[in-house]
């Protein structure tokens, strides 16, 4: 696979675009960062941009309107960049004063000249140490 950027650079750039879209515009702008046939796996499974936009709009409507994303790991596998991230969302409205922590994975695929998420999983919850 030919990449002008390293997997880490691609992942950090994607996370920054996701943060900007979510923090500025919410669900519609964020859904555009997914491939047309992408799948989002969270509390429910959403397939395609329209369903993903609806799922994200529900989260946004609950007050989780600001997010910060930290890329933990990124690697190229085949034509994809696999990304592991941690996120913190801050609430407003019904969730004012609360912070939601979680982890997510993205399988990023190059669509035309843009890296988009082909599959995204998100798990809410505080960090859990690994058993030794």
Place the predicted regions along the sequence by residue:
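Hydrophobic/aromatic beta-strand elements that line small-molecule binding cavities or substrate pockets
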Residues: 56, 69-75, 87-89, 103-109
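Short beta-strand edge/turn micro-motifs at domain boundaries
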Residues: 101-132
């Amino acid at each position: 696979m030919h990449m002008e950027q390293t997997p880490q650079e691609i992942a950090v750039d994607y996370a920054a675009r996701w943060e900007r879209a979510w923090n500025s515009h919410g669900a519609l702008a964020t859904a555009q960062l997914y491939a047309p046939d992408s799948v989002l796996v969270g509390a429910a499974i959403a397939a395609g941009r329209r369903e993903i936009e609806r799922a994200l709009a529900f989260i946004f409507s609950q007050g989780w309107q600001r997010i910060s994303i930290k890329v933990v790991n990124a690697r190229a596998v085949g034509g994809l960049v696999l990304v592991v991230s941690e996120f913190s969302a801050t609430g407003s409205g019904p969730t004012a004063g609360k912070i939601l922590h979680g982890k997510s994975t993205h399988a990023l695929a190059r669509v035309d000249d843009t890296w988009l998420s082909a599959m995204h999983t998100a798990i809410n919850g505080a960090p859990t140490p690994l058993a030794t």
